[in-house]
Amino acid sequence: FLQASSREVNILIPFSGEPMEVCTAQGNGAELEALNTTVQDLAPGGGTDMYAAALRGLEELKNYDLSQYTPAIILLTDGQSEGSFRAFADAYEELGAQVPVFSIMFGDADETQLEELAQYTNARVFDGRENLTEAFRSVKGYN
């Protein structure tokens, strides 16, 4: 799943029509294993509001000294977002940090929305429709 450094922080924000409970793992030990279990137990369902999830990610980043990390948001999405790109863009500008928002698309993801988000945040879109694990590894290597 993930291979993290001892200083790395991974924050999981599952979402459908809205963001769900935030899960955090620091380092590469038991917390990361627990995060992996949480991911494995997730089941897709409901709507898709990737912008709200990305906004929550920006809010979470405010809790860290970003100069000590290489921050990035990685969205895994299988649908078309029902949320507002403009609301995300406003919050992104307010944060004042250049945090790339990478996307991994699978299922019926809307590539146009993902490309717009990637272009705005200086990131990329990865295609996970064939191999989600490889797409995720590509994102981690890119950041």
Model regions: which residues?
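Von Willebrand factor
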Residues: 1-26, 53-54, 72-76, 106-109
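Loop/turn elements at helix/coil->beta-strand transitions in domains of secreted/extracellular proteins
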Residues: 5-10, 66-71, 96-102, 121-124
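Mature, Sec-exported extracytoplasmic domains of Gram-positive
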Residues: 7-8, 20, 31-37, 50-51, ...
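Exposed, interaction-prone extracellular/peripheral surfaces
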Residues: 16-18, 28-45, 52, 63-66
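VWA/integrin I-like adhesion module and closely mimicked acidic/polar interface patches used
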Residues: 41-48, 55, 79-131, 135-139
